[in-house]
Amino acid sequence: MSRVGIVSWGAYIPKYRIRTEEVAKIWGDDPLRIVDLYLVDEKSVEGIDEDAVTIAVEAAKRALKRARIDPKRIGAIYVGTESKPYAVKPISSILVDALGLSNNVFAVDMEFACKAGSEGLMAAVGLVESGRIEYGMTVGADTSQGEPGEHLEYSASSGGVALIVGRDGIVAELEAVYSFVSDTPDFWRREGSPYPMHGEGFTGEPAYFRHIIGATRGLMEKYGYKPSDFTYAVFHQPNGRFPVRVASMLNIPIEKVKPGIVVTHIGNTYNASALMGFAKILDMAKPGDKILLVPFGSGAGSNAYVFTVTDTILERQKTDVPTVEQMLRDKIYIDYAQYLKMRKMIKLFE
């Protein structure tokens, strides 16, 4: 693999938060039991004028600002989301104009549950590596859905992350990648349905754990990595328990996982989930650090990446772009009625 990697990153988390205990009280659940079950204290909620498009735009603008490159040098843009405002109309084309990209650009909305943004990353890497484009961008953004009263409601949240890929000015060089995919019916949403469904027992062992472990072990066996090689490990975060447990199953010390865990404070941002943890690590990483990144998407599949941080990251970290940690602290709490209003879940019938 020729030299290619992350040139810049940008993240966006809506300011609004609803506490898990607030949701639990509405549905008669024991708040302490729910918090302990999912290890999610609160989740981010998009504002009434926000959606996956505005979230993607904000994250992408921050990535461009940090990179200090002309937007017209971006030759491809990919958007991964489960929260498209339009059934037929791409978000990626909206971003082309909103970001001031050239019209001579590859633009595609990706689909693979929570790892669609990760697939966009590999697509961008391939085009950059081939020499067809100078820079590529992938965005993972969601305003994820959870049916009222159903357990997904405790974690489904909103946020976005954008990554710029290139050869020049690399902050995290891509060393290796490995993919593990199978037909596993753990989670789905049919056409026209407002909320997803999940296969209960399929969401754990057969889906999340099997695929993340399959991708990570496959990568380690193919390229000769050991758990001790990684400074940080970031996994998909559907709740606070799963990433910690999968790290233990892979013999990766919890100290390497905790710095990238954000789900406790903002819930599961779906396509931005693992990427948000990755962005948080990039905000603090030092040259020479090695990062294991393993997104997961229901249906099901996982990609395992290894990045090595370069000296260039020190310059990128000095910009005034908000860090993930700053956004985690910048919040406004809302109650359940405001939550329903902001998520447009109150329907009026004639």
Curated annotation (Swiss-Prot):
Keyword line: Acyltransferase, Isoprene biosynthesis, Transferase
Residues that, per the record, bind (3S)-3-hydroxy-3-methylglutaryl-CoA: D30, C114, S155, T203, H236, R245, N268, S298
Enzyme Commission number, as recorded: 2.3.3.10
MF (Gene Ontology): acetyl-CoA C-acetyltransferase activity; hydroxymethylglutaryl-CoA synthase activity
Pfam families reported for this sequence: ACP_syn_III_C, Thiolase_N
Catalytic residues (positions): E82 (proton donor/acceptor), C114 (acyl-thioester intermediate), H236 (proton donor/acceptor)
Single GO biological process annotation from the record: farnesyl diphosphate biosynthetic process, mevalonate pathway
Binding locations of CoA: R241
Family according to the record: Belongs to the thiolase-like superfamily. Archaeal HMG-CoA synthase family.
NCBIfam families for the chain: HMG_CoA_syn_Arc, PRK04262.1
Function statement: Catalyzes the condensation of acetyl-CoA with acetoacetyl-CoA to form 3-hydroxy-3-methylglutaryl-CoA (HMG-CoA). Functions in the mevalonate (MVA) pathway leading to isopentenyl diphosphate (IPP), a key precursor for the biosynthesis of isoprenoid compounds that are building blocks of archaeal membrane lipids.
Protein's name according to its UniProt entry: Hydroxymethylglutaryl-CoA synthase
Native source organism of the sequence: Pyrobaculum islandicum (strain DSM 4184 / JCM 9189 / GEO3)
